[in-house]
Amino acid sequence: MSDNPTPESTPEAETPEVEKPMEPQGKVFDEAYVQSLRQEAAAARVAKKDAVEAAEARVKAEYEAKLAERDTAYTELQNQLGQAWIELEKVYLSLDAKVPNDKVRAFVEILEGNDRDSIAESVKSRLELVGGFGNKTPSPAFDPSQGRGGKPPIPLNGDPILEAIKAAVGIKK
């Protein structure tokens, strides 16, 4: 093994490079063709963007319409609740003022006001106008044709009948 190579075993010429026939070569396109492809892609992107924006606008419009409808329904319910509260306050204040049960509805119809204080003032003024309820003590039921209420009957002759007539007429002795 010598340090010098022998010429018989090594070729003197360098190996020529071999072309690679198996590798595909890139295609070369014309600039106008590339521009048309780019324009088609841009048109497709713009069309998709427009379609998305139109769909979003349609959904937003539908949602806003439903939201407006619900707001209207909510406002109507709040108004009905307010009216029911006012009516209930009128009934409660009428009952607190000792209005008879059979006259409460008629009394409530003449009351005015939208809050507790104004309704209370209306109740006071209407009670004064009507003259109040329940202030008069009812007289006990009395039917003179039905006897004397458990007392012994008056004899038809003598002084007791004369005294009863004098008492009924108001004659004093």
Curated annotation (Swiss-Prot):
Function: Scaffolding protein involved in the icosahedric procapsid assembly. Coassembles with the capsid proteins to form the procapsid, in which the scaffolding protein is found within the external shell of icosahedrally arranged capsid protein subunits.
Domain of life: Viruses
Coiled coil segments of this chain: 36-84
Signal peptide per UniProt: none
Highest classification ranks of the organism: Viruses, Duplodnaviria, Heunggongvirae, Uroviricota, Caudoviricetes
Region (Disordered) location: 1-27, 134-158
Keywords: Coiled coil, Viral capsid assembly, Viral release from host cell
Biased composition (Low complexity): 1-13
Protein name per UniProt: Probable capsid assembly scaffolding protein
Family membership noted in the UniProt record: Belongs to the L5likevirus scaffolding protein family.
Gene expressing this chain: 16
